[in-house]
Regions:
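Glycine-rich phosphate-binding "P-loop"
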Residues: 63-66, 192-201
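Glycine-rich beta-to-alpha transition loops that act as phosphate-gripper elements at the mouths
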Residues: 93-98, 223-229
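Core AdoMet radical
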Residues: 28-47, 51-141, 149-159, 179-184
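Conserved C-terminal portion of the radical SAM core fold
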Residues: 135-194, 206-224
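Terminal or standalone catalytic/regulatory effector modules within metabolic enzymes
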Residues: 1-5
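Canonical Radical SAM [4Fe-4S] cluster-binding loop centered on the CxxxCxxC motif
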Residues: 6-43
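A short, acidic, amphipathic alpha-helical segment used as a generic capping/interface helix at domain edges
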Residues: 208, 229-230
Length: 230
């Protein structure tokens, strides 16, 4: 009975080393998307303040890379510290694969929740990505949870998966039972292998959300990418 509003800041965009077929920020595909590196803490603070003023309950820092390098992780930590001191909004992160030490540091910096999506069912995943495994993603979720971070995970629907595979993903989410579930609806990006993928019917999208809510009644569900066009 409550709407939770979260604003994302894509602090590092494009040129990701992974080959996820849906992603316009992968270095494997020519999508014409602008590339930029990490901003300064001051630049992020300005945007975080605006997000809070506009009613956001949380602010999520997202980076398009496989995992943060030690140098980039230090920069992200400085950004988080500045947000904590100067804004006072709940911080969440989506930074790719983490080490145990990095996860513990995020917890120390009062990061509330860590996002790392499964993307799709385990049986579908090899068709979607070949540069890392499904187990790699599960391992990162376990590392984050062991560090005391709340979990946000989910996937993308409309990748060409079957209904059975959507249920497979949902059952995996029910096993993990994250505090937050994020579901994206594919927006086909020109230049990616899925650029010609047919959109899901709205009735199918509603059915998927209904099943997720039925199986995970306590998790926050967030409608993420694709919500504007579906």
């Amino acid at each position: 009975n409550k709407v939770d509003v979260e604003q994302l800041n894509n602090i590092k965009k494009n040129a990701c080393s992974e080959d996820c077929t849906f992603c316009g920020q992968s270095a494997f595909f020519d999508t014409g998307i602008e590339t930029y590196q990490l901003p300064t803490p001051e630049e992020v603070v300005i945007k975080a303040k605006k997000a809070k003023e506009e009613g956001a309950d949380s602010y999520c820092l997202v980076a398009a890379w496989k995992e943060p390098s030690p140098k980039d992780f230090i920069k992200v930590c400085k950004i988080i510290t500045e947000i904590n001191v100067k804004v006072g909004i709940s911080v969440e992160c989506s930074l790719g694969f983490l080490t145990k030490q990095q996860a513990s540091k995020l917890k120390e910096l009062k990061v509330k929740r860590y996002n790392h999506n499964l993307e799709t069912a385990k049986s579908k995943f090899p068709e979607i990505c070949t540069t890392h495994t499904y187990q790699d993603r599960l391992d990162t979720l376990e590392i984050a949870r062991e560090a005391g971070l709340e979990l946000c995970t989910g996937g993308i629907i409309g990748l060409g998966e079957t209904r059975e595979q959507r249920l497979e993903l949902t059952l995996e989410l029910a096993r993990i039972y994250p505090e937050e579930i994020t579901i994206n609806i594919l927006v086909a990006v020109p230049g990616t292998p899925l650029e010609l993928q047919v959109d899901l019917a709205n009735s199918e999208i509603i059915r998927i959300f209904s099943v997720i809510r039925f199986l995970l009644p306590e998790s926050v569900i967030k409608i993420s990418g694709g919500r504007e066009t579906n």
